Amino acid sequence: MLRVLHRAASALVMATVIGLAPGVAFALAEPTSTPQAPIAAYKPRSNEILWDGYGVPHIYGVDAPSAFYGYGWAQARSHGDNILRLYGEARGKGAEYWGPDYEQTTVWLLTNGVPERAQQWYAQQSPDFRANLDAFAAGINAYAQQNPDDISPEVRQVLPVSGADVVAHAHRLMNFLYVASPGRTLGEGDPPDLADQGSNSWAVAPGKTANGNALLLQNPHLSWTTDYFTYYEAHLVTPDFEIYGATQIGLPVIRFAFNQRMGITNTVNGMVGATNYRLTLQDGGYLYDGQVRPFERRQASYRLRQADGSTVDKPLEIRSSVHGPVFERADGTAVAVRVAGLDRPGMLEQYFDMITAHSFDDYEAAMARMQVPTFNIVYADREGTINYSFNGVAPKRAEGDIAFWQGNVPGDSSRYLWTETHPLDDLPRVTNPPGGFVQNSNDPPWTPTWPVTYTPRDHPSYLAPQTPHSLRAQQSVRLMSENDDLTLERFMALQFSHRAVMADRTLPDLIPAALIDPDPEVQAAARLLAAWDREFTSDSRAALLFEEWARLFAGQNFAGQAAFATPWSLDKPVSTPYGVRDPKAAVDQLRTAIANTKRKYGAIDRPFGDASRMILNDVNVPGAAGYGNLGSFRVFTWSDPDENGIRTPVHGETWVAMIEFSTPVRAYGLMSYGNSRQPGTTHYSDQIERVSRADFRELLLRREQVEAAVQERTPFNFKP
């Protein structure tokens, strides 16, 4: 039973970041207590949740199950409706609960065996970790039982949830959204919220910092509107472990995590862990090695909710080939999907063991289990070790490069059927490189540090592409390689970089050509671009025009190479492409961009932040930062402008944390869209003004910090 006690909040000492322009020093508040606090975490003697002024739960448990229970209770309070909907979907009952809009997801999950496999995986958990999963689910149920009016009637039917539901949601998210997805298998392509995943990560060794302390950046970029990509900030403390950070809602472990000893972060990588096999149908079966094989067939069914609230049973025949489950595309072709890692139930426990490791050796032992199916993972600790791993369950393939395996692979020959996967040591990794840092911004794993320590020739060509690194990824390498003696303050300033690297690479050729064009409007635009500091700041008057020109020059996603004078090269991965191949064509594109900018925004010199707005509830503030493919390290992807030329973020910076492994640890960060989306919450729009100002708040780990900031206490008792 939980009860909630309210009291007036004490004054909260926040970190304040001052200034947006490059070169302006970032000033932080003094630490809230004297340095040299002991590394040992506070050891709770009772179970309670202390809520700070931003709705962050600081969960103190007398043991691990108690902390997991409190974590489930806190997530339900902050995101209960969305979590229950996600759990209902992962159960394979979305169509039954909510109707036709969920039918495709239901069929996708049932055909791939997700609900059934989740039950098996739940049974295969270690007893201790299964108890943690049960406790997390019990916390969700307890909150809903104690606060029934706070849960939407639409999702109450999902209750109660179980530890198996927790596993099912994680399994669906990792294996059947990140690794395999319905859009890729059905040939429709991923929707933007799934296709545009991204993140930034840095880890810096002590020798590259001013104070001799390692530094870590956590910075995922995902959709702001998609439930399963919504992040949640929390702090868990027991006598045996401490974890602070953020993770997607519904997950019982924190994936972007740190404590007084170490931390990790993740970025989406391009590992191809799923293969779509194109089948040749014949005589009711499929061709394989010159013979017709029958499909394995299994009869199943699901219920579909009707408009009047009734349900009808829908039969579902599940066909499988030797490769895996079979799906029919809209054009009538049959495709079988084979997903690596479906024999590995331990992803959640591996993450938990990674983020509670007592040494780098312990961390490596957890990583070597290879239960986490994808992601680049970056590590740093207070002893000074840093590591980058191109992690994932990667099939061993006899031939073909990554482009071949990303496509529709012939399914009529056993030569393409993979049955084994690579161990961790086969994958691109680097520990404590000479350059003193590791990084990843969703680029292929060939420049995780600078100078590089390995090349693509050291690895199979199907592991990762040798394709152009984005300008954001190039900027990531340069921001780290060109800065030494880093303080936490300077580290934070670099994270806020919103320089238009593409402008640096192209304007020296475009501007002179435009200045001699006879069109006065083109000349005026050239002068505007020449006066621009090439930063996506809120007061920039040329950024919108440049963005429109760059879309014509480099394509809709700003990733095209053909128009550059010098294209990208693996030999010069952080300084190419550059130059304008055809200045006359580029000037004509500028002429078109002038018209497009006027049509969309009313003028070519409208301030960037006047059009790019951060709007949540009744908060409406100017935005800064731009598209990663234009070179902005700090990323926001903007919606199409409305009739007033106003656009808002649809994707980009969500959680950001910058950590110094000092004694005690210092950390600052923000959750762009707040820490709750339940109806009536005050913690949805309460951080967006700080995002606009890059005004990072101190993240509170030490008990005395939390006590000084507490707004509400929730004592609880938990008995398994």
From Swiss-Prot:
Q: Known Gene3D superfamilies for this protein?
A: 1.10.1400.10, 2.30.120.10, Glutamine Phosphoribosylpyrophosphate, subunit 1, domain 1, Penicillin Amidohydrolase, domain 1
Residue positions assigned to the propeptide? 188-198
| Signal sequence, start to end | 1-29
Enzyme nomenclature, EC number: 3.5.1.93
Subcellular location(s) per record: Periplasm
Recorded hits in InterPro entries, A to Z, give: Ntn_hydrolases_N, Pen/GL7ACA/AHL_acylase, Penicillin_amidase_A-knob, Penicillin_amidase_dom1, Penicillin_amidase_N_B-knob, S45
Q: Which UniProt keywords apply?
A: Antibiotic resistance, Hydrolase, Periplasm, Signal, Zymogen
Q: GO terms for molecular function, please?
A: glutaryl-7-aminocephalosporanic-acid acylase activity
Choose any GO biological process term that the UniProt entry carries and state it.
Answer: antibiotic biosynthetic process
Q: Name one GO cellular component term.
A: periplasmic space
Enumerate the Pfam families for this protein.
Penicil_amidase (PF01804)
Q: What is its main location?
A: periplasm
Q: Which reaction does it catalyse?
A: (7R)-7-(4-carboxybutanamido)cephalosporanate + H2O = (7R)-7-aminocephalosporanate + glutarate
User: Where in the sequence is the active site?
Assistant: 199 (nucleophile), 221, 653
Family assignment from sequence similarity: Belongs to the peptidase S45 family.
Q: Which PANTHER family match?
A: ACYL-HOMOSERINE LACTONE ACYLASE PVDQ, PEPTIDASE S45 PENICILLIN AMIDASE
Biological role stated in the UniProt entry: Catalyzes the deacylation of 7 beta-(4-carboxybutanamido)cephalosporanic acid (glutaryl-7-aminocephalosporanic acid or GL-7-ACA) to 7-aminocephalosporanic acid (7-ACA). Cannot efficiently use cephalosporin C (CPC), penicillin G, or ampicillin as substrates.
The entry describes its oligomerization and partners as: Heterodimer of a small subunit and a large subunit processed from the same precursor.
Q: What is this protein called?
A: Glutaryl-7-aminocephalosporanic-acid acylase
